[in-house]
Amino acid sequence: MPKMNVESFNLDHTKVVAPFVRLAGTVEGANGDVIKKYDIRFKQPNKEHMKMPGLHSLEHLMAENIRNHTDKVVDLSPMGCQTGFYVSLINHDDYEDVLNIIEATLKDVLAADEVPACNEVQCGWAASHSLEGAKEIAQDFLDKRDQWDKIFSE
């Protein structure tokens, strides 16, 4: 296959083993700032996916809560394939700390009693949420914490 512009299109999705957290890209700005993008893969590509209401609530919960654990977050976004998220951090290069930040954020999800910004003023599809679904996805990922640094099958 020809090399593509999008990093994830060059990843052989048949060779990865979810769940995992991998460095997906690094960009250096003109003034020396470095942004690292991480692939937080919750589900095995082309085998399973997160259902939208749970994924949507997980996005809200993670996007809000991750910023309580680091001030380096540029963005946290869901993947269109519904198998994971991307998180981008600026001037932060400690992979183990990234794993700890994600773990703490997902523990916040489990402790949540509501989905932040789950209303028509703050959300573009407020009817599509599931706190319970988000908690199930988070718990499943946390249960496999020891696998997060293993991206490919051996």
From Swiss-Prot:
KW Iron (keyword) present: yes
Enzyme Commission numbers on file: 4.4.1.21
Name recorded for this polypeptide: S-ribosylhomocysteine lyase
Function, in words: Involved in the synthesis of autoinducer 2 (AI-2) which is secreted by bacteria and is used to communicate both the cell density and the metabolic potential of the environment. The regulation of gene expression in response to changes in cell density is called quorum sensing. Catalyzes the transformation of S-ribosylhomocysteine (RHC) to homocysteine (HC) and 4,5-dihydroxy-2,3-pentadione (DPD).
Top-level division of the source organism's lineage: Bacteria
Protein source organism: Staphylococcus carnosus (strain TM300)
Family: Belongs to the LuxS family.
Database matches in InterPro entries: LuxS_sf, Metalloenz_LuxS/M16, S-ribosylhomocysteinase
Pfam families: LuxS (PF02664)
